Amino acid sequence: VKELGQMWQVDYSDLDNLRIEQQNTHKFLHDGFFDPTQRYFQIAANASNRMEFIDTETRKAVGSLVTGKKPHPGAGANWIDPKCGPVAGTTHLGEGKVTVWGNDPKGHPDQAWKICYSVESDGPGLFIRTHPNSDYVIFDQTKHPEPEIQQAIKVLDKKTGKIVKTIQVTDVETALAVHTEFNADGSEFWVSVWVRGGKKNWLKGEIVVYDSKTLKEITRVKGLETPTGKFNVSNRMHHRT
């Protein structure tokens, strides 16, 4: 419940007798995602510059971590780091940074709910995504005021924890690049091009498709009206983040 600074967990196994349990958190809650086991819920408290972590089995908060200015993970990203084991990451609305933390309290208790590393980017962003079959984590820089930076996405190597490529998605003056989504097998990732400027530009949007191995452009789906979020049904059903 965003404005209250509370997480409400609803047990709907008996619809006639719903049970709601409340956990106090920092404010304001916005955008969350589960770890790969689907036990721990990871959610941004962006006004407090924190990520909050809830154990959905015990229904208790297990951690709270300062990550940077206004974390905004979108649908989030989970992957395996060579040093820290299972990790997750977030972009930030208030600064150009991706923060990565451990999220495996059973297998890697020393790393759980602690920062593994942070990486600086060129500007603040909205969304971060990956896929188990991809070597990379992709994130945007949509909130930076300079068009050239808004129009580019960054590629983070899972093995090294370093940014290995900047992809200029568009060079249209009033456009920006936003929101990455992988296809079901992780062989492609799709990025939206969102064109501003009123009705005259409504149908100038695009979805750009990239090869997730070579990072090269495959094709562009053109003539779209301000495309933004793209959600692969298979990935969401099987919790591939």
Describe each model-derived feature in a short phrase.
Residues 1-241:
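Predominantly soluble domains enriched in secretory-pathway, periplasmic, or organellar proteins
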